[in-house]
């Protein structure tokens, strides 16, 4: 595996940054790279890829097309991914050819829920009670230990509420197991919480680091609908949360950015939910609410440029545009304080993120 770069990568014709994945996050990563003076090369399968419109070059290929991946890696000085569920063999191949930020260990930990929880617990986070489920016998036994029911989640390849089902004592466990593909799962207890929050830590390959202000989030059906930031958290809790997040990042060997999603329970305690080693929907407000957005900071961490804590320039609200969004735009267009971001996706589907709105609220 190629070591993480220590020398600064400055903009020039030979220093091309690689981006894996052609969606809205890849697009916004590329736009920040361009703003900073870098050229970008995108790798993604053919499809509805809005990032293709803003990069300098792109390669269409599947995630197991190793010849094309090698060609891509030979053309970039380092690479990052817009999503965590990139195949392990793909990451291993790329890591032997170029510098991948964050590293493959970070991505693997984010892909497997059980590993994610184990490393969170090792870092000092409290997690929901959970059980690894390998078969229906495990599921039956573990479900009896969940007094208030639980959430059965596939151990890998789940995001935005996909690959998970709530269960209770009346559930048909055999049917649910089959519907999830009869694959390894985790069963988590259902928590009563006051709110959902997220924190983002970042570390440059020059070893400087920092945090963004904390976000408060509202989800519906597993999909983020609205974020308000900065979230108000008492100083002791915020300091403790930063320490644990930094410890988690150290245990992962992180360079790049890391979002950590959490629950604040009714008693004020904070419980780990999951990580995302990439730009995160709950920090899209930073595009307007900070001097450096999460995408700008990712570029700096990739290129070994110094970073530090980022402060907000007020209180911001981010609203996702999901599925058919025209009515929302019709209403919000009456208020010039809304800043509209459309991702340029051609096909509208229920539950698909099509854009977002940012607005300063104080």
Task: Identify what each model region corresponds to.
Residues 109-198, 202-248, 362:
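Active-site nucleotide/adenylate-binding loops and adjacent lid/helix of ATP-dependent enzymes
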Residues 180-233, 239-272, 276-284, 299-309, ...:
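Phosphate-binding core of ATP-grasp and ATP-grasp-like enzymes
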Residues 1-5, 13, 300-362:
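Peripheral (often C-terminal) accessory segments that flank ATP-dependent C-N-forming ligase machineries
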Residues 286-288:
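A conserved FAD-binding loop/helix module that cradles the flavin
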Residues 51-52, 155-157, 348-352:
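Short, flexible turn/loop "capping" segments at secondary-structure junctions
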Residues 1-111, 137:
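ATP-binding N-terminal substructure of ATP-dependent carboxylate-amine bond-forming enzymes
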């Amino acid at each position: 595996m190629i070591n993480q770069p220590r020398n600064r990568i400055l903009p020039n014709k030979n220093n091309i940054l690689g981006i894996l994945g052609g969606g809205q996050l890849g697009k916004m990563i590329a736009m920040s790279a361009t703003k900073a003076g870098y050229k970008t090369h995108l790798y993604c399968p053919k499809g509805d890829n809005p990032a293709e419109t803003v990069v300098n070059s792109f390669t269409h290929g599947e995630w197991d097309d190793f010849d094309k991946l090698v060609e891509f890696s030979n053309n970039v000085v380092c690479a990052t991914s817009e999503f965590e569920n990139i195949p392990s063999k793909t990451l291993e191949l790329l890591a032997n050819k170029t510098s991948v930020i964050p590293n493959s260990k970070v991505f693997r930990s984010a892909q497997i829920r059980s590993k994610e929880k184990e490393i969170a617990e090792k870092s000092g986070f409290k997690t929901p009670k959970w059980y690894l489920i390998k078969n229906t016998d495990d599921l039956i036994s573990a479900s009896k230990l969940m007094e208030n029911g639980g959430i059965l989640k596939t151990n890998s390849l789940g995001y935005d509420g996909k690959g998970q089902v709530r269960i209770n004592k009346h559930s048909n466990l055999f049917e649910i197991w089959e519907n999830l593909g009869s694959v390894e799962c985790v069963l988590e207890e259902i928590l009563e919480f006051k709110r959902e929050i997220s924190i983002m830590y970042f570390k440059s390959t020059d070893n400087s680091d920092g945090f963004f202000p904390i976000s408060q989030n509202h989800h519906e059906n597993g999909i983020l609908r609205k974020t308000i930031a900065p979230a108000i958290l008492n100083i002791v809790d915020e300091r403790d949360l930063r320490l644990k997040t930094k410890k988690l990042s150290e245990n992962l060997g992180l360079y790049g950015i890391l979002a950590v999603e959490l629950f604040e329970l009714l008693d004020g305690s904070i419980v780990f939910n999951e990580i995302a080693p990439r730009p995160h929907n709950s920090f899209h407000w930073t595009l307007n609410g900070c001097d450096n957005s999460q995408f700008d900071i990712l570029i700096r961490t990739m290129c070994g440029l110094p970073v530090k804590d980022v402060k907000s320039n007020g209180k911001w609200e981010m609203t996702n545009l999901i599925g058919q969004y025209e009515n929302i735009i019709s209403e919000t267009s009456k208020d010039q304080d809304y800043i509209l971001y459309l991702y340029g996706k051609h096909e509208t589907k229920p539950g698909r993120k099509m854009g977002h709105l940012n607005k300063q609220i104080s």
